[in-house]
Amino acid sequence: MNLSIAIPDSALSDEKTLENKTRKISSIARSCGIFRVNEIIIYRDGKKNESDLKLFVTILKYLETPQYFRKTVFGKTNLLKFVGVLPPLKIPNQIGTANPKEIKKNEIREAVVVRVKGQKGVDVGIGQIINYYSKHDIGKRIIVKIKSVFPDFSVKEITRDEIPNYWSYSVKQSGNLFSILSNWNGVKILTSRKGKLFNPERDIDTLKKSNGSVLVVFGSTDRGIHDILGNKINNLQNSKTINFFPNQGTQTVRIEEAVLGCLSVINTFDSSNK
């Protein structure tokens, strides 16, 4: 299943401090890693949240980036003030030995394009730069496959589509939610307490017929999907509105709780039906 989620840019509005906002983003990122989310879409819900939007996108991308070239990609910014207290994701694109002698042929690594002594190369996190001429700009992230190993490394650039298993998530900023949903080619799951209760037999069967492309959409704490979309919700095709938290004991479900809960339910029943 190719799983994506959409979250409003106002998702951080209930947190007042940079540290708490950072921790909330981390919780969402970890849930996405655990349940193999391929893309996180941050959409605008009608409010102006420029600072939160920038923070959200920056930290999501930072956490997904392998540690060995985070400084190269992000430099220094106050937005990352509290990321040092966050647990690492340890998703597949971040797992790999730093010992060059242990690198295996055909191993896939994240890399960043660098320039050393006037020549381009790539840093793959092994303490040495591998010579590689790239058409990309310095600082650009790419994915490479190891063609030859220690001591004379060589690499080949590949696309994410060439990786057979889950690798990591990507982050995308987008416009209004209705536009995203109208252009989505696949099943759309709208999470709402006003929706039908989750039915494993019915809803997982829908996911299996989705051609592998599923978008799970979340509202914010103070504005649900129906409030954000209004009457336009009735014009959506190939969508389901589902309540994943029947008989909830709290007045509201926080966004990080909603992401974890909904994805765990989908994952549990999807896995059990394979």
Protein language model regions, located:
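Post-transcriptional modification and biogenesis factors for structured RNAs
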Residues: M1-K274
